Amino acid sequence: MPIPFEKVDLGYQKVFLAADAKKIMSGYNPESMDDRWFIYYEDSWVYFVRSWTGYHIFGFKLAVSPNGSANVIASWANRNIDEYQAKSKENDIQTINDLINGIFDVRSND
């Protein structure tokens, strides 16, 4: 599925240590039907895709420093109501944090 046309800037800001950034950039492939997310890194962007539908729900762009740490410099959330029923930007940011913490065991460095 393509990146959604209807999206909103999230203003998501995070700093990841080098080891954590590497984990995130390696992505995540669902292992079972219970896994609801597919996460991949492409052209400096991390994309969060619903594994069952293929819809892109969130994305954020990383600026990677020479030491390997990474800053989120742009972010968005899908606002196509046929693809994602958003509650709020705050809820979207919490969902991203929960996914990063749960899937990659990553804690932000900010």
What are these regions (language model features)?
Residues 5, 57, 67-74:
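A broad structural signal for short, well-ordered beta-strand segments within beta-sheet-rich domains
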Residues 1-45, 83:
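Negatively charged, low-complexity tracts enriched in Asp/Glu with abundant Ser/Thr
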Residues 69-110:
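Polybasic, proline/glycine-rich intrinsically disordered low-complexity segments
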Residues 46-64:
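Canonical SH2 domain fold
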Residues 31, 40, 52-54, 67:
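A generic structural signal for short, solvent-exposed coil/turn residues
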Residues 41-44, 64-70:
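A short, structured loop/turn motif at beta-sheet edges
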